[in-house]
Amino acid sequence: MSIFTPTNQIRLTNVAVVRMKRAGKRFEIACYKNKVVGWRSGVEKDLDEVLQTHSVFVNVSKGQVAKKEDLISAFGTDDQTEICKQILTKGEVQVSDKERHTQLEQMFRDIATIVADKCVNPETKRPYTVILIERAMKDIHYSVKTNKSTKQQALEVIKQLKEKMKIERAHMRLRFILPVNEGKKLKEKLKPLIKVIESEDYGQQLEIVCLIDPGCFREIDELIKKETKGKGSLEVLNLKDVEEGDEKFE
């Protein structure tokens, strides 16, 4: 699809339109194809690599630019770059049925790949294959959302799959080195955030090796920094606690 803008008659090609309805009116932006998903997933961070122009339209294909008063009424501002960001993040990508089908298939597989990479069978600590996760996603009738990143959706899928199969996020293995004086007291505060304590060593400092849920990492890191006033340290030994070997659950 090619369009002309009425103000400067610059020809825009390879256009992907993102649309949002707000305050009873339609607003559109012109993006480069294949860049919208990259922006939403966080891979692409340069707005100029995504937007063909920072203008907001009511109809991209006709080159009709939105009126300033309509932008203020709908978005509370006439800052077109900021409005473009809102539409880019939350709007609906206008694509053909064939393009949409291809996009959904790719996102479905990407989500399954993330889940397979992050999760294991909790009983065996063995990872699952992407094919098995895809099959499980179809069994729960998971519907891909194009306005959410694949990472966000992978976390949703994990929650839903837990109700149907033995699956959990692979634990992270950490080492804490804490001042002895604060160590024992801090250990009690850390306990609810720790899955398994593998070893403890009391010497001049308290050293603990443990497994945690990855979702607790930030809270643990902040707690150690706060309680030890920067004297304690945290080291990631393994991002994923997975059994050695090539065997995967099919």
Swiss-Prot record:
Give an example GO molecular function. Answer: RNA binding
Q: Which Gene Ontology BP annotations are present?
A: bone marrow development; bone mineralization; cytosolic ribosome assembly; hematopoietic progenitor cell differentiation; inner cell mass cell proliferation; leukocyte chemotaxis; mitotic spindle organization; rRNA processing
Query: Which GO cellular component term is one of those annotated?
Result: cytoplasm
Q: What does the UniProt entry say about where the protein is found? A: Cytoplasm; Nucleus, Nucleolus; Nucleus, Nucleoplasm; Cytoplasm, Cytoskeleton, Spindle
Keyword Nucleus present in the record's keywords: the answer is: yes
Alphabetized, the UniProt keywords read: Acetylation, Cytoplasm, Cytoskeleton, Disease variant, Nucleus, Ribosome biogenesis
- Residues with PTM N-acetylserine: 2
The record's section on Gene3D superfamilies has: 3.30.70.240, Ribosome maturation protein SBDS, N-terminal domain, SBDS protein C-terminal domain, subdomain 1
* Impact upon substituting residue 67 to E: In SDS1; uncertain significance
**Summary of the tissues where the protein is detected:** Widely expressed.
Q: Does the keyword Cytoplasm apply?
A: yes
What is this protein's function? Required for the assembly of mature ribosomes and ribosome biogenesis. Together with EFL1, triggers the GTP-dependent release of EIF6 from 60S pre-ribosomes in the cytoplasm, thereby activating ribosomes for translation competence by allowing 80S ribosome assembly and facilitating EIF6 recycling to the nucleus, where it is required for 60S rRNA processing and nuclear export. Required for normal levels of protein synthesis. May play a role in cellular stress resistance. May play a role in cellular response to DNA damage. May play a role in cell proliferation.
Please give the PANTHER family that the UniProt record associates with this protein: RIBOSOME MATURATION PROTEIN SBDS (PTHR10927:SF6)
Q: Which family does it belong to?
A: Belongs to the SDO1/SBDS family.
User: Could you identify this protein by its name?
Assistant: Ribosome maturation protein SBDS
- Gene designation per UniProt: SBDS
